[in-house]
A protein has these predicted regions:
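Glycine-rich, small/hydroxylated-residue low-complexity segments
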Residues: 24-568
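Hydrophobic alpha-helical targeting segments used for export or membrane insertion
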Residues: 8-12
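Short acidic DE-rich linear segments
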Residues: 7, 22-23
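C-terminal motif of bacterial Sec signal peptides marking the signal peptidase cleavage site
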Residues: 16-19
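Bacterial N-terminal signal peptides that target proteins for export
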Residues: 1-7
Length: 568
């Protein structure tokens, strides 16, 4: 079993289990009115109602937050309950979670449904009610009936039966419980007990984790919740079968969480991270001081399938130490903003800034004549429609599936095939062609939608050094005053393979394009390329002050370079 397979096993098992819990804003007490209104005789029925409602909530949340996005890969999330047996102070029930996945998640293979049964205990009494808790629910996974999960793990990890059983047994030691409050607040926790997996020279020693989710049943479907995760130290060893070398990775405790409130505020915090890798070339330590972030106006938009609002986050003091020698890397800042426009479309943008420790770069590569200081990338899309977003995602899903099938047919190669293999290959090739057609149709639809809405794309790239900076920017979209009807675009796009000039002519007469590249002369001098630029690039470059500049624009159907029509 390879290192990444071991890790995947843990994540796969844990995610399936936690999904089976009730998933989770806690009230210290239920309201006094609600508590006193519940009589002892009413409590069993109330507890059952809340238990069933909380399970149904998981399916509703899936529909609102995940189901529409084809790239999520989860095509079905269903929980059913049967055998609910009620007592005076507790009840038992059997719940079944059924999951189905898109083929592109598993290399194009349809793995079928994965089901997990859970034996649930629902406790209710006056002592709990005094704390505001209507029902305390504990879930126990039935590992004796997990054939579908074992089959998936076996097929995807290619692990021994013993290790598959060991991985599934993790579920037996999984502790999941939920406190459902009278005011509809829920606190759900999932704890994974320590375990070890060994396959040949590869191993995983996992010390456990605990996840806590807090939410309100009324607002959880809108993506409002708090999550905290604590992962105990874990170590894994992987062996390279080719050269016989091995590496041991030790990860220190990981703690973090994030939350989204009803007022649209967002916070995220991850405590310092430390990872040690021991291999034949020595000890390498990767560290960072943590991740912090905040946001406002954050709200899930089911049409666009993402959160709206403004968010900023920081990754602080990234550094690497190799055999005692320190290499400070820098900091990362990220900003995003997604807003709905008056037209019903969306403006979405993101900015990424990497503050670089130039001394470290020079230390690693002394031949570099400058010290990099920062790299900034900024992208903004204006007037993006939800339909265009959906078409793009569906196109990417179909394209991914076609690539998966292509990989399968390439494995067969051009060797002589028996009749069964030849027929199977032919069916795969037909399926691949079908997916390629779907992808082409979806991408075409997304383009038509973007043209109709005059969607614009703005891109900026900036690199700063101790000797100056270089920038590139581009802004493009259909002109605001364009009067070309959608039907003309649709016809040109549909016939682009037979008559590409029709689409080119439409773009030439309707596309608004502005692009600029700029670099400080002080930087080109330091890099030793100033003479080359002036001798070989005079046709494309102009000088503005202390900068070399190249500008490209489409001016009413005429492409211009630095204000002059292109000579070709």
């Amino acid at each position: 079993m390879q290192l990444k397979q071991l890790t995947l096993a843990v994540l796969t098992a844990t995610s399936l289990l936690v999904a089976c819990s009730d998933e989770p804003k806690k009230s210290d007490k239920g309201t006094k009115t609600e508590q006193t209104a519940l009589k002892a005789a009413d409590l069993p029925q109330k507890a059952e109602d809340r238990y069933r409602a909380n399970l149904a909530l998981a399916a509703k949340t899936y529909e609102n937050l995940y189901a529409q996005n084809p790239m999520r890969g989860l095509t079905k999330y269903q929980i059913t309950v049967k055998d609910y047996q009620r007592g005076d102070n507790s009840a038992t029930a059997k719940s079944t979670l059924t999951l189905e996945f898109a083929p592109h998640l598993f290399g194009g293979n349809n793995i079928g449904a994965v089901t997990l049964d859970s034996h649930d205990t629902i406790t209710y009494n006056q002592e709990l009610l005094a704390k505001g808790i209507v029902a305390h629910v504990e879930n126990h996974i039935d590992t004796d009936n997990a054939a579908s999960l074992k089959a998936v793990l076996k097929e995807q990890l290619h692990a021994s039966d013993a290790n598959i059983e060991r991985l599934v047994s993790i579920l037996k030691n999984l502790k999941m419980q939920s406190d459902i409050y009278a005011d509809d607040n829920v606190v759900a926790t999932a704890e994974v007990a320590p375990f070890q997996v060994q396959e040949g020279d590869d191993s995983l020693d996992f010390k456990g984790l605990k996840e806590e989710v807090r939410y309100n049943m009324k607002t959880m479907p809108d993506g409002i919740f708090d999550l905290n995760l604590a992962v105990e130290p874990f170590t894994f060893t992987a062996t390279d079968k080719k050269d016989g070398g091995s590496a041991t990775v030790a990860v220190s405790p990981l703690k973090g969480g994030y939350g989204i409130k009803e007022d649209g505020s967002f916070t995220v915090k991850v405590e310092p991270i430390k990872i040690e890798v021991t291999a034949k070339d020595g000890l390498t330590i990767f560290e960072l001081d943590g991740v912090t972030g905040s946001g406002s106006g954050v709200k899930y938009d089911s049409a666009l399938m993402t959160y709206l609002g403004d968010i900023e986050s920081n990754v602080n003091n990234i550094r690497v130490t190799h055999n005692g020698e320190q290499y400070p890397i820098g900091d990362i800042n990220g900003k995003s903003s997604t807003q709905k426009t008056a037209s019903g479309n969306y403006d979405a943008g993101g900015e990424f800034t990497f503050k670089i420790d130039g001394a470290t770069v020079k230390k690693i590569e002394p031949s570099i004549p400058v010290e990099p200081q920062s790299l900034r990338v900024k992208i903004k899309i204006s007037e993006l429609s939800a339909q265009s977003q959906l078409d793009l995602l569906q196109g990417f899903e179909a394209f991914q599936q076609s690539l998966n099938i292509a990989a399968k047919t390439s494995d067969v190669g051009y060797m002589d095939k028996d009749k069964a293999t030849a027929e199977a290959t032919a069916n795969l090739e037909k399926s691949q062609a079908d997916y390629e057609k779907i992808a082409q149709e979806k991408f075409s639809a997304a383009l038509q939608e973007a043209i109709k809405n005059k969607t614009r794309l703005n891109y900026q790239l900036e690199g700063v050094t101790d000797s100056g900076k270089a920038t590139f920017s581009a802004d493009m979209g259909i002109r605001a005053d364009s009067a070309t009807p959608p039907e003309a675009w649709q016809k040109a796009i549909a016939d682009v393979q037979n008559n590409p000039m029709a689409l080119q002519e439409l773009l030439k007469n309707n596309l608004d394009l502005h692009a600029e590249a700029r670099i400080n002369k002080s930087l080109t001098d330091k890099l030793g390329v100033s003479q080359f630029i002036e001798s070989q690039g005079a046709m494309f470059i102009t000088v503005e002050g202390e900068d070399y500049v190249a500008k490209l624009e489409n001016d009413n159907g005429t492409l211009k370079l630095n204000g002059k029509p292109l000579p070709f």
